[in-house]
Amino acid sequence: MEGRPPPEGRPPPRPRTGRAPRGRRRAVFAAVLHWSHITHLFENDRHFSHLSTLEREMAFRTEMGLYYSYFKTIVEAPSFLNGVWMIMNDKLTEYPLVINTLKRFNLYPEVILASWYRIYTKIMDLIGIQTKICWTVTRGEGLSPIESCEGLGDPACFYVAVIFILNGLMMALFFIYGTYLSGSRLGGLVTVLCFFFNHGECTRVMWTPPLRESFSYPFLVLQMLLVTHILRATKLYRGSLIALCISNVFFMLPWQFAQFVLLTQIASLFAVYVVGYIDICKLRKIIYIHMISLALCFVLMFGNSMLLTSYYASSLVIIWGILAMKPHFLKINVSELSLWVIQGCFWLFGTVILKYLTSKIFGIADDAHIGNLLTSKFFSYKDFDTLLYTCAAEFDFMEKETPLRYTKTLLLPVVLVVFVAIVRKIISDMWGVLAKQQTHVRKHQFDHGELVYHALQLLAYTALGILIMRLKLFLTPHMCVMASLICSRQLFGWLFCKVHPGAIVFAILAAMSIQGSANLQTQWNIVGEFSNLPQEELIEWIKYSTKPDAVFAGAMPTMASVKLSALRPIVNHPHYEDAGLRARTKIVYSMYSRKAAEEVKRELIKLKVNYYILEESWCVRRSKPGCSMPEIWDVEDPANAGKTPLCNLLVKDSKPHFTTVFQNSVYKVLEVVKE
């Protein structure tokens, strides 16, 4: 039959253009659109292309500046390997300690980007292509002119550009994800448009590019897409499992918090298994992949024991044990529901107990503040570290306005409709099973476990987002993915038989676009130009008026800038996830307590501090009742409550224990008088 000519009078069949190429083009378009959007917002907000090198570094505030400083170290080192050695034997970040910052701060993104930058500049130099253009910018108002360079040859521009490209590609993944989950390209369109319409609730990469989530989150999207594929597939292929392992590693390596997200995923998958939507073989393979990726991260992070003592690691071990004990569970003569409860309790209490034991055995307390933070959300628990977190808006409960913003763009109503449809399916599936009294009656698995998994993951992200506002950055994008299921024939086939799905989807998108376009316009209207003259004066004074080995202490955000731009040793910094660093910061912040100046000076001398950068605003500012620094110290040090805060006294007169050596409208540098 092959090669047979078509019958007379009938034209030859037209070659069929597959849906895949069209889908790929749309995914690429979504990627380019998001890259352009976040690049435009970042430039509009900072006028980054016209800033000097120092201004660009100051624009990376708090922990952003800390992370970027290690990229700068490797880029400016005599060789790449020398730069890596320097960050692995760092003497500036927690003086006088020598620490492996690659192990402590999840700096693989900076290592990789620095290597790419060095390769890029060498190749461009070799073939004679100019990589940056520099010019002099006149600032006016009596300020000195500055040199500003633009192009990928500038380290800061290269660093930011790669981050934006990665997050542009993430939007292509969202289109593919929504398409695959819903079974319709319309689903991919819904996901992408929901993300854009709720952009300010979905990401902050355009305002804070160097944060760990900017590197890590795109790989979580890929990882969840792979999990969806594995749950849906009738046959597991080795390639899918290897891809899942790699995406796990790429998600965990840049971000310490990744383990908590993966904990919610493992818990959701375990629940999906318990109620019968995936078989034991599939879950066991997923657990093995997670264990392998965790072990790889442990090795690549130079034996970072915080990974092994995490709730995530404990949960993996407990679930593996439950799966191994399945024959014993089936021998228990109880109802199906009772068996679910038994396995759930075994997982919950087993995970908590194993986590406690491993932390005690390894002597790890680095993540103790996470438990205290969660405790403070439900009870009246307070301590110094917890208050530093909860007094910051991003660690407070979700704003009351957030659900309203979701509702205005119709994201919340659409997701609720999808969620209710999934719950109806679950109830329908479970009805017959729960009516039985014995556990051995069910011989088959339910269909569409990936839908149940996404519903459970939505609940987990909702809990995280409500408890800690910053974590809505997981919730909102997942809601956008869930919204794609409004196009799913598995859930709404009964409706699509009566009404064309395109008509329903485009009607919903048209309604969404009313508030969505207003949200986008609000973002586009943000126009600013970065300037921080007081900090610029401070950095310039430090660079030219202090010795290269002078040791500084002060507020965490300022210390990151001192290390990055002045290259001076510091004793504390914004990466607060280490128990030792939290203890150091408490000593440094005692300057804002009501303790005696002599006592504070004595502790600073023990840390070998030469200069303290005092900021009066830290003494008086108050984000909400009980959140000024003196009030936080009243919880930690009630014996001195009622006394005048030390910072207020030192603002007026720093003698005799300190000497004022520099002062401007924001900063006052105190030299510690040695005894």
Swiss-Prot record:
GO terms for cellular component: endoplasmic reticulum membrane; membrane. It is found in: Endoplasmic reticulum membrane. It catalyses: L-tryptophyl-[protein] + a di-trans,poly-cis-dolichyl beta-D-mannosyl phosphate = C-alpha-D-mannosyl-L-tryptophyl-[protein] + a di-trans,poly-cis-dolichyl phosphate + H(+). Widely expressed. One of its GO terms (molecular function) is mannosyltransferase activity. Its main location: endoplasmic reticulum. Pathway: Protein modification; protein glycosylation. It is a multi-pass membrane protein. It comes from the Eukaryota. Its EC number is 2.4.1.-. GO terms for biological process: protein glycosylation. Keywords: Endoplasmic reticulum, Glycosyltransferase, Membrane, Transferase, Transmembrane, Transmembrane helix. The chain crosses the membrane at residues 66-88, 156-176, 186-208, 236-254, 260-279, 286-303, 309-325, 334-354, 414-434, 449-469, 491-511. Residues 1-22 are annotated as: Disordered. It holds the Pfam family Dpy19. C-mannosyltransferase that mediates the C-mannosylation tryptophan residues on target proteins. The reaction occurs on the luminal side of the endoplasmic reticulum and involves the transfer of a mannose unit from a dolichylphosphate mannose (Dol-P-Man) donor to an acceptor protein containing a WxxW consensus sequence. C-mannosylates the first two tryptophans in the WxxWxxWxxC motif in thrombospondin (TSP) type-1 of UNC5A. Regulates neurite extension during development. Belongs to the dpy-19 family. This is Protein C-mannosyl-transferase DPY19L1. It comes from Homo sapiens (Human). The gene is DPY19L1.
